[in-house]
């Protein structure tokens, strides 16, 4: 029977494979059904056919093309006209359907027209007869004519084509030239260039027959807003740009020019395929100057906006001009079809793009920054500088924007920010936004900024976790035999493939049943590396006691009493599923003879026993007999060592690095295992007597089991309480990782069981402290378990026979908890070694020197003494604990004051002995309480240490005592800060108070005599530690640390002696900072000897000396003339003097008690006034820094004028002198400043109200200098001065006035006009200038 030739589409339709028509035609280049003979199965699978579809295709192929010699002979004898020889398909491009609907639509359309669409035409057949073309409908109108859809009947094929009708009137070249160009166009074969089938020569028009693109042009698709979300996303546009560049690169290699590259000439064939059309059409039609230069109108669509300047000016079309057009095409794509240079005429476009003042299109909102950079390169004015298509094609793959996936929702939408949800895909447009945010675009086309930290990288191509079906496309099984039962292989060396376990350890499905087998050990395991209990068990407990979630309570409560098996079987216990270790992430419960167990992957990860080197594994409830044979004694039965020898609870962890055994070992038979179990149980129960109190323990054990059963919700359970655990998998339940908190009742029961186990233990805890190597466990030693010790990381057994004696019935301290709180007091006490013996002779000597003599050394307790705080001091007797200990907490201010008053009442004098520091108060630093500095109090001469006396070594502070750190180092001036005037006032007031107190004391009656011959020394910032610690002059003493003598410590008092007004206005920290600088910067001796510094010291010394003289002579402070003292100081001196004369002794002490913080008066009132003055001299003896300064100061003092000396010497006798006038005041100030070449801080404070204002200084004022710096060359000092005087010396407004005049210089605004203009716009300079002359800012 003969079969006629069948069309490819009809053949596929009959085979029900019509959906593969486009793929067969374009990918496999099959044009008729007979060519399926040469298509291999791999080729068909490549285009998506499944095996059943391939078999169906072969079946219908055999039907239409049987393999018989008769058919071959007939085929050879057929007419040549019916067998059209085809040549190879173009370019190997792939055109796949958009989806099933569009593919079926294309197929139905092809079936309707009864034609297929071959991608190849006969060679040299670019002239097509007019009668072979049938026009169906018009698709649109182009610049060169109309475009229609039709069918080309080529022999036995019908091809759907697009027909472009060109009017002869539009053609400016003769038909022969056009045919030459058409022949060139016909020879182009590329996957991204539309194929030209041929040309139809009609009488009135020319028709170009090309491929038909069902999805219209790219420009139409871009303008369709509905396609933005589903189709034309940014990644798709980037892929289209690469395909367009690929086609243009092909033309560039062929030395061909397109001349009209634009989005309207890019045709979309599928969701991922575009092709360039109308190649060379303008040249074929002979379009010349008129088309390009005279078609200037507002509605211009072609092609001025796409042409390079040289094309418009000189009609010079090159590949560089195509590159320019490619840049414009990219701009169209990323602007979604927006017309370039919209609303501009051709002449305006030429003016905009032509040099020298050329402009360029702005970056579209959805355009990635890299692509816009490429556009700017394509729009280089110099054609030679534009990149070539080959270079662009190499760059484009690396320019694709990165895609990110949002992991959180955008909760707070902001302006210009993306509003995205979790799971949205964001394409990055720009990373360099100048902000922490990136610019991106969603798949919806919305652009904005987003936080990149809320996203992760999105990779396409990764397999989805929610697959609808299990795909086996990659399986290349060639055999067509059906799958039969005998073809399913038996387990080969392993159960992995039956348990959904791959060779690499990857699993899917439920593999819990694998873990229930005792003999199968190849379930993948993983050691949890971030947490290793064996490494930090000594530092940190796994769980906080007394929670029963640790395995110790489990073992003691449920698994360590073999007598619980009433029927002779192995004792089966049910375990509460909440008993999982804290380090487990995914616990797997393995049923072992009815016993739930956790398995450690290796002994090194088990915190409850020492590491074992052997591979022998034993289950505690297998009850090995006395013969020593183990049912699992074969080596290699399990590749990991057992965590606890008799512990039935294995901590099972997943491990990737374990190597499975080479051969599957099923172990002994089930019958042998049961017999061995029975034998071991009978041997165990018959050979050992019951221990005392066993019944009580057993009852408690049963109660625990019952409570565990009641609380159990998930996990591997077994209810055969009496030990009928013969088949381990019969009572197994599905493993689960859920955790249920243990109830309070169960917790109490378990804790009670632990206490009972501790009470009946026959072993002492003292053995646990001894260092011993762990013994390899043997099968004979049943139920041997030990407490691990924190210092030992586990414990072994000293005697090998313990496992066979009473330990089988009475667990030897079955609590394996690593926590000390699990022990009772006796056990805890016995487990602690004798610290007295551990310390030794050297440690005891160090203890005595550091602890007992700490009053001298002033340190906290040693580490050994710290440890003693946790123990009973009755255990040992250290010989020097009789000394009174320093309190661990800071004493209160009230207690401190009471102690000091008691000392003063008893007339105590402090000496440098060992106990002098025990009752000393801990003072808070001054910066914690107040900002006023108390001048160093005078010290008794008998308390000053000898200069050659050794300085005690400072040691670390007491542990547990919160040390208040000193203030952080602040900005330090280059030159020392002179003590300001208010610091002077505080100093003088303290001296006055001290004089009052000294006058009150009966022991210092000789101290009232003045010291006129005392040399004037620098006492401004002298630190008392110079007297006490001459070897450490730079040590700072205003920390909260105990000192040798309280009198020698710096004290920073509150402003108790000042009036509220003084306290409010004079509380600065300048003097404090000066002292810190003096103490810290000991390397500035050269600077301190400079005239500036010595003058400052001199000035302050003069003030202090005269004040002392005036105070001792009982003169009014206001009569001190010629000195640099401000009004506030004079007023305060009056207050202090009146207080001294009018207030009795009792009122002074009452005044002190009124303040919240006492002044901590030193116990120096019993010392003579002579010693007070002499101690000031001794203050400088130990300070090397001030020694060097003293000489310079004294030299400066000797150089002072005779007039000032006489002025100061006349003060004591000038009690009746008149108050100083202002003229005298300024004269004295000028005289002082004449001899000084420094300006100190007090100068600035004093003359802050008296210095000349900026208006008085004129051009030299600071305001003018600032304005000149701000305005630069735009203004002069005189002009700035005029603006300042006009605006009443407001610098900011003056600057705006001059800037406004500069910005609107054409208007020649006056200051008045500028002021009014700025006033109207609320002094907004930019707005004012813009309103005045339209200036763009």
From Swiss-Prot:
Phenotype reported upon loss of the gene: RNAi-mediated knockdown results in a low frequency of dorsal defects in the developing embryo. RNAi-mediated knockdown does not rescue the small eye phenotypes induced by hid and rpr overexpression. Simultaneous knockdown of Ack and Ack-like results in many embryos failing to properly secrete the cuticle likely due to the loss of zip expression. Mutants also display defects in the dorsal surface including holes in the cuticle and germband retraction failure.
* An annotated Gene Ontology molecular function: protein tyrosine kinase activity
Record region (Disordered)? 714-739, 786-822, 906-969, 1024-1045
Pfam families of this UniProt entry?
PBD, PK_Tyr_Ser-Thr, SAM_TNK
Q: Where does ATP bind?
A: 139-147, 164
Domain CRIB as annotated: residue spans: 488-502
Q: Which residues form the active site?
A: 260 (proton acceptor)
Print the keywords alphabetically. Answer: ATP-binding, Kinase, Nucleotide-binding, Phosphoprotein, SH3 domain, Transferase, Tyrosine-protein kinase
**Modification sites for Phosphotyrosine:** 291-292
Q: Where is the composition biased (Pro residues)?
A: 947-957
Q: Which InterPro entries match?
A: ACK/TNK-like_SAM, CRIB_dom, Kinase-like_dom_sf, Non-receptor_tyrosine_kinases, Prot_kinase_dom, Protein_kinase_ATP_BS, Ser-Thr/Tyr_kinase_cat_dom, SH3-like_dom_sf
What's a BP term from Gene Ontology annotated to this protein?
head involution
GO cellular component entries: plasma membrane
Residue list for modification Phosphoserine: 71, 764, 778, 831, 918, 924
Q: Which residues form the Protein kinase domain?
A: 133-399
Pinpoint the SH3 domain residues. 399-460
Query: Per the record, what are the reactions this protein catalyses?
Result: L-tyrosyl-[protein] + ATP = O-phospho-L-tyrosyl-[protein] + ADP + H(+)
Please describe what this protein does.
Likely to act as a downstream effector of Cdc42 during dorsal closure, acting in a kinase independent manner with the other ACK family member Ack to positively regulate expression of the myosin zip by promoting the endocytosis of Egfr in the amnioserosa (AS).
Q: What is this protein called?
A: Activated Cdc42 kinase-like
| Gene that encodes the chain | Ack-like
């Amino acid at each position: 029977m003969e079969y006629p030739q069948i069309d490819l589409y009809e053949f596929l339709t009959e085979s029900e494979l019509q959906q593969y028509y486009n793929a067969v035609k374009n990918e496999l280049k099959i044009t008729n059904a007979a060519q399926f003979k040469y298509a291999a199965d791999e080729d068909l699978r490549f285009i998506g056919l499944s095996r059943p579809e391939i078999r169906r295709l072969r079946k219908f192929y055999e039907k239409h093309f049987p393999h018989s010699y008769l058919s071959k002979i007939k085929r050879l004898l057929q007419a040549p006209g019916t067998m059209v020889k085809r040549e190879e398909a173009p370019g190997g491009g792939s055109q796949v359907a958009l989806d099933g609907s569009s593919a079926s639509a294309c197929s139905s359309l092809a079936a309707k027209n009864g034609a297929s669409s071959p991608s190849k035409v006969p060679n040299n057949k670019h002239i097509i007869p007019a009668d072979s073309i049938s026009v169906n409908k018009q698709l649109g109108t182009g610049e060169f004519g109309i475009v229609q859809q039709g069918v080309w009947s080529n022999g036995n094929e019908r091809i759907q084509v697009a027909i472009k009708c060109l009017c002869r009137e539009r053609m400016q070249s003769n038909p022969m030239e056009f045919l030459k160009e058409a022949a060139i166009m016909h020879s182009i074969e590329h996957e991204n260039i539309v194929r030209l089938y041929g040309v139809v020569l009609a009488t009135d028009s020319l028709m170009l027959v090309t491929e038909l693109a069902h999805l219209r042009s790219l420009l139409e698709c871009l303008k369709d807003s509905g396609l933005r979300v589903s189709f034309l996303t940014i990644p798709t546009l980037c892929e289209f740009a690469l395909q367009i560049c690929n086609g243009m690169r092909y033309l560039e290699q062929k030395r061909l020019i397109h001349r009209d590259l634009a989005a309207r000439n890019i045709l979309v064939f599928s969701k991922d395929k575009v092709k360039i059309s109308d190649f060379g059409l303008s040249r074929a039609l002979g379009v010349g100057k008129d088309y390009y230069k005279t078609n200037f109108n507002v509605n211009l669509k072609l092609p001025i906006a796409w042409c390079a300047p040289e094309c418009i000016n000189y009609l010079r079309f090159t590949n560089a001009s195509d590159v320019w057009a490619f840049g414009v095409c990219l701009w169209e794509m990323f602007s979604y079809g927006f017309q370039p240079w919209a609303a501009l005429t051709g002449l305006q476009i030429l003016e905009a793009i032509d040099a020298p003042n050329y402009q360029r299109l702005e970056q579209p909102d959805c355009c990635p920054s890299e692509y816009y950079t490429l556009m700017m390169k394509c729009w280089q004015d110099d054609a030679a500088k534009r990149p070539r298509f080959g270079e662009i094609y190499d760059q484009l793959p690396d320019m694709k924007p990165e895609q990110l996936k949002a992991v959180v929702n955008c909760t707070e939408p902001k302006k210009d920010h993306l509003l995205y949800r979790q799971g949205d895909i964001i394409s990055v447009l720009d990373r360099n936004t100048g902000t922490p945010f990136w610019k991106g675009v969603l798949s919806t086309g919305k652009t904005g900024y987003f936080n990149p930290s809320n996203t992760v990288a999105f990779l396409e191509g990764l397999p989805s976790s929610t697959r609808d079906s299990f795909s086996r496309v990659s399986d290349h099984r060639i055999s067509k035999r059906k799958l039969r039962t005998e073809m399913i292989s038996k387990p080969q060396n392993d159960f992995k493939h039956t348990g959904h376990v791959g060779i690499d350890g990857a699993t899917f499905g439920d593999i819990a049943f694998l873990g229930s087998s005792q003999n199968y050990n190849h379930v993948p395991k993983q050691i949890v590396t971030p947490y290793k209990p064996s490494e930090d068990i000594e530092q940190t407990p796994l769980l906080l006691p007394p929670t029963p979630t640790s395995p110790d309570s489990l073992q003691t409560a449920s698994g360590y009493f073999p007598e619980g098996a009433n029927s002779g079987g192995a004792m089966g216990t049910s375990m509460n599923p909440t008993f999982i270790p804290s380090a487990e992430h995914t616990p797997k419960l393995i049923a072992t003879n009815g016993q739930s167990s956790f398995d450690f992957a290796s002994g090194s990860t088990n915190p409850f026993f020492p590491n074992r080197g052997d591979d022998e594994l034993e289950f505690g409830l297998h009850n090995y007999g006395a013969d020593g044979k183990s049912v699992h004694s074969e080596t290699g039965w399990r590749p990991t060592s057992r965590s606890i020898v008799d512990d039935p609870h294995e901590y099972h962890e997943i491990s990737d690095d374990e190597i499975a055994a080479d051969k599957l070992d099923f172990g002994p038979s089930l019958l042998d295992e049961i017999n061995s179990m029975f034998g071991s149980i009978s041997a165990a129960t018959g050979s050992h007597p019951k221990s005392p109190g066993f019944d009580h323990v057993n009852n408690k054990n049963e109660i625990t089991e019952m409570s565990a059963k009641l609380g159990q919700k998930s996990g591997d359970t077994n209810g055969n309480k009496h030990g009928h655990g013969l088949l381990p998998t019969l009572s197994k339940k599905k493993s689960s990782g859920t955790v249920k908190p243990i109830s309070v009742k169960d917790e109490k029961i378990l804790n009670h069981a632990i206490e009972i186990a501790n009470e009946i233990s026959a072993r002492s805890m003292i053995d646990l402290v001894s260092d011993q190597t762990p013994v390899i466990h043997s099968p004979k030693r049943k139920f041997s378990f030990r407490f691990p010790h924190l210092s030992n990381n586990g414990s072994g057994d000293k005697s090998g026979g313990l496992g066979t004696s009473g330990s089988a019935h009475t667990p030897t301290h079955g609590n394996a908890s690593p926590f000390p709180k699990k022990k009772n007091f006796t056990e805890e006490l016995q487990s602690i070694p004798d610290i007295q013996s551990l310390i030794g002779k050297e440690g005891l000597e160090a203890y005595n020197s550091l602890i007992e003599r700490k009053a001298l050394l002033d340190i906290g307790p040693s580490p050994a003494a710290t440890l003693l705080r946790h123990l009973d001091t009755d255990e040992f007797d250290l010989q020097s604990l009789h000394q009174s200990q320093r309190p661990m907490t800071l004493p209160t201010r009230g207690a401190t004051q009471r102690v000091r008053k008691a000392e003063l009442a008893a007339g105590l004098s402090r000496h440098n002995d060992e106990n002098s520091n025990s009752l000393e108060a801990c003072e808070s630093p001054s910066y914690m309480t107040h900002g006023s500095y108390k001048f160093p109090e005078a010290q008794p001469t008998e308390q000053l240490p000898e200069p050659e006396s050794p300085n005690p070594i400072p040691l670390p502070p007491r542990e547990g005592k919160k040390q208040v750190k000193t203030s952080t180092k602040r900005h330090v001036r280059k030159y020392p800060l002179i003590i300001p005037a208010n610091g002077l006032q505080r100093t003088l007031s303290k001296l006055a108070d001290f004089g009052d107190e000294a006058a009150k004391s009966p022991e210092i009656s000789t101290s009232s005599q003045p010291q006129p011959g005392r040399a004037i020394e620098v006492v401004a910032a002298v630190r008392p530690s110079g007297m006490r610690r001459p070897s450490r002059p730079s040590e700072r003493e205003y920390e909260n640390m105990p000192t040798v003598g309280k009198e020698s410590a710096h004290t920073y008092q509150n402003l108790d002696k000042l009036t509220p007004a003084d306290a409010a206005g004079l509380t600065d920290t300048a003097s404090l900072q000066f002292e810190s600088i003096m103490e810290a910067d000991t390397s500035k001796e050269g600077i301190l000897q400079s005239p500036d510094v010595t003058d400052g010291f001199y000035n302050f010394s003069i003030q202090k000396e005269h004040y002392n003289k005036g105070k001792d002579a009982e003169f009014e402070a206001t009569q001190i003339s010629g000195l640099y003292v401000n009004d506030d100081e004079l007023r305060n001196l009056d207050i202090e003097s009146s207080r001294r004369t009018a207030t009795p002794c009792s009122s002074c002490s009452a005044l002190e008690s009124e303040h919240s913080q006492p002044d901590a008066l030193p116990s120096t009132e019993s010392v003579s006034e002579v010693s007070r003055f002499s101690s000031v001299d001794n203050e400088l003896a130990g300070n090397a820094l001030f020694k060097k300064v003293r000489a310079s100061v004294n030299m400066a003092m000797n150089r002072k004028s005779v007039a000032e000396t006489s002025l100061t010497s006349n003060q004591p006798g000038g009690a009746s002198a008149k108050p100083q006038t202002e003229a005298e005041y300024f004269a004295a100030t000028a005289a002082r400043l004449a001899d000084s070449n420094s300006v100190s801080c007090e100068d600035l404070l004093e003359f802050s109200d008296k210095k000349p204002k900026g208006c008085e200084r004129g051009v030299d004022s600071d305001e003018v200098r600032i304005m000149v710096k701000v305005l630069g060359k735009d203004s002069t000092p005189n002009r700035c001065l005029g603006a300042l005087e006009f605006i009443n010396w407001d610098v900011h407004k003056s600057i705006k006035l001059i800037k406004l005049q500069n910005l609107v210089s054409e208007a020649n605004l006056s200051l008045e006009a500028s002021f009014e203009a700025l006033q109207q716009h609320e002094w907004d300079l930019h707005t004012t200038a813009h309103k005045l002359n339209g200036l763009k800012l």
